[in-house]
Each structure stands twice: as structure tokens, then as C-alpha cells.
């Protein structure tokens, strides 16, 4: 009798243990499936973003726009997608929509230097020079060698006729990325405006050679 009770108790223990093991396995499987699904979704979105970027580069902005909108619908916390969507809006001169998308990107990642640079550049295009300066400087705060932010800040100061500041940031942009042809052009224009014709000629010559080489 005593042995039967022990056997019965062992059976219950084994059954409970088995249930716990099965529950644990199911939990692990759910985690793996969820993780794999999430990774698969992210991979698909990355491929779609790459494809949309190629479409935009080819001038097919409306097609690119549809893809980026779909990605942001599927993955609303994808700050890269919101940034890329804003870039297409900007290229199609839908500036208010572009601003909103950049702001969304930055609400998700406030230190994302690309969006900070891009929204700063857009504000410069729209003539909002104070806001442009604020965002471009923030971009450089988080990514000190970001050549595009330095060049855009240099161009902003050029537009404001603050030539010394413009020269400082344009030269910095070239240190960080020596192949920035536009920086040479702007430096040449500053030299020309300040009467340094020979220096201007040299910069324009470098700019011209770079443009021809890139064709």
C-alpha cells in the first residue's frame, strides 16, 4: 500500500514536471518564432528601403513614396524609414510633409544625426536660418565628423554672409570627406567675393575636375 502511494506520488510529480517542461518548451518556441518573424520583417523592410532608395535615385519618387509609406505603416517606430520618407517628400518639394516626417524620426531617435542634418538642410532651403543652424549644430554634436552637416552649416553661413564661419566649416567638411566637390565650389566663391582671385581660381579648378571625374 505504501509503495502504491509512493508510485502514485511519483507519477503526479513526473506529470507535473512534464507539464512544466512542455510549457517551457512552448514558451521558448513562441519566443523563437516571434523573434524570427520580427527579424524576417526587419530584413524585408530593409530590402524594401534599399529598393525604394534606388527608385528615388532614378527619379521614380512616387513609387519610392508608396514603399516608404507602407514601411512606416508596418513598422511605425522605424526612424530610418521616417527619415527616408521625409527625404522623398523633400525632393518632391512637399516640404511641410517632409518636416513632419523628420520630426517623427527625431521623436523616435533624438540623436539621429542624419535626420538632424536633413531637417536642418530643409529649414535652410525654406529660409528658416535660425532653425537650420540649431539642427545642423546638433547633428555635429552627436556626430562630430559628419561631413554633410559641416558642409551644410558652411553653406548656411555663406548664405548669411558670415564668410569666416562658412570657411571654417567648409574646410572641416573637406577634412572629414575630401571628395566633397560642392565644398570646393563654395570656398572658391568666398575667395572670389573677398578679392582672392587666384585662390578662387584654384578652388573652381578642383571643383571642375571633381565633377568631370564623377561623370
Describe the role of every protein-language-model region.
Residues 4, 8-19, 26:
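Short, low-complexity, charge-dense intrinsically disordered segments
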Residues 24-33:
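Bacterial N-terminal signal peptides
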Residues 44-46, 79-80, 113-114, 147-148, ...:
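Helix-start (N-cap) detector for alpha-helical repeat units in TPR-like alpha-solenoids
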Residues 44-80, 87, 91:
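Alpha-helical segment of the N-proximal tetratricopeptide repeat
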Residues 57-70, 91-104, 114, 125-138, ...:
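Structural signature of tandem alpha-helical TPR/SEL1-like repeats
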